[in-house]
């Protein structure tokens, strides 16, 4: 996934009210940028971090910048914008870069499904395969060398697990794909210490046949691409 506009470098001053960040640009100007990440962002929003913003010329927007990338004080690259995870995976599906999801004739994004009126991130279809429902989650939480999801309690995530498990029970294929946007994460584990209910539902989903994949990303100020499969600690 390429950034169409050149990103603007700066230094993070602070993140506040979940969706706002103060950033000092390299020319000394201080701007307020939109933070497109609703999670706790533990370790991903430390003052003094090097950050990159995407500019917007849309006059209807209140804020002229969006926070896209960061580099931790330990030197790890992070994809801040969780909306990019679906774009990264969409590109990987289009180029057949995910070995476990190859061989499907069509890829449809944002398809309604299930009894709870959810939207699945991707529905893969083929005349010789059963439909495959793919839900994408962005992972950025690193604690003591281990990557975790979620970084905050997620009722929405619990709903997605219920729906994926239900699709498997109806005879379809369902995949939960963790898009790891943190260069320091080498494996992914469910954060039972943060959301025990999600961990319980995740175990049930795996038990009934929901498949789980975790992939790292190669991140720089020009683009983010899905890179290689990571161990998923279940």
Swiss-Prot record:
MF (Gene Ontology): DNA binding
One Pfam family recorded for the sequence: SfsA_N
InterPro entries reported for this sequence: SfsA, SfsA_C, SfsA_N
Domain of life where this protein originates: Bacteria
CDD domains registered for this protein in UniProt: SfsA-like_bacterial
Coiled coil: none
Classification via NCBIfam families: sfsA
Designated name of the protein: Sugar fermentation stimulation protein homolog
Species per Swiss-Prot/TrEMBL record: Pseudoalteromonas atlantica (strain T6c / ATCC BAA-1087)
